[in-house]
Amino acid sequence: MKYVIFVSDKNKFMDKILNISTVSDYNAYWGIEDRHPLVNVLEGSQITHPIRNCRKNFGLYVIFLKDVRCADYLKYGREEYDYQENTLVFVSPGQVFGYPEDGSTYQAKGWCLYFGPDLLRGTQLGRHIKDYTFFSYNVHEALHLSLQERETIIDCMKKIDEEIKNGTDKHSNTIIASAIELLLNYCDRFYDRQFITRKKANKDILTRFEELLDEYFTSWKPQRYGTPTVAYCADQLHLSPNYFGDLIKKETGKSAQEYVQGKIMDTAKDLLVLNQKSISEIAYALGYQYPQYFSRAFKKAVGCTPNEFRLRN
């Protein structure tokens, strides 16, 4: 384990970030022995000593199940978040997560599953791990479990823990990876439930998305920044791109990119019919750097060229 230290001139404090590159590194942080080189399951009651707070840069996949509401805030990247009990938080390699180091300690509670990317190599899960987009959600987009869902997740973690206890043989990694995949599939199901139960909030986001696109195309932004990207829209709505994309897909049946492209084409149709600007002027107004790119995209989406559409309408 190594520390990376950042010093803030403004606040005059040192922000230490602990690099957790391996399962062994994280075991050492908890003060426990290695059981398997690539994976571990930890239940909070196993840790009887206080743990120091610090932010951690993970080279692992980590899933936290918190049993209690946190009294303090959690820092995830640059975001601060106070989360509820029975919350699942997902961290993927390269993400920074944890409480800033201030000399305080805490008592471990809940469950934690962590595993290295090497565990997945050559497995079904390794080929599809990127399909579990919630590993890239922001922390305020965490999964909030019902009591029954919580028991399902704990049961999955116990099965993984039991396999680790059985010792390592040629089948171990495949069996453990399959058990992790089952857990992640349950998480996918539970996120679908969460999207449904938060339908009103999701509709509000969809309305704000529409308003954002309307405002974008009536401003100077297309000429300066080009056509709006999914990442830009997600950032303006204070959502991670993956969570935003999944939400739009579940609400509309279209990907966020398809939705943006549809909005561009609808705006283009209005401009073609309602004013006398040239095709090039309309292309630039929509954020296209080259008019031929606009014409090509329009024909692909609408089935005719912009000029043909104008003549028909």
Can you annotate each of these PLM segments?
Residues 86, 244, 293-294, 298:
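Short hydrophobic/aromatic patch on the recognition helix
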Residues 1-82:
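Generic protein-terminus/edge-of-domain signal
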Residues 250-289, 311-313:
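Terminal helix-turn-helix DNA-binding modules in bacterial transcription factors
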Residues 8, 102-166:
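A hydrophobic/aromatic-rich effector-binding and dimerization subdomain
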Residues 177, 199-237, 258-277:
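A short, Lys/Arg-enriched amphipathic alpha-helix from helix-turn-helix/homeodomain DNA-binding modules
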Residues 151-214:
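An amphipathic alpha-helical interaction segment
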Residues 83-97, 114-117:
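Conserved metal-binding segment of the jelly-roll/cupin
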Residues 295-313:
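…primarily DNA-binding HTH/wHTH and HhH modules…
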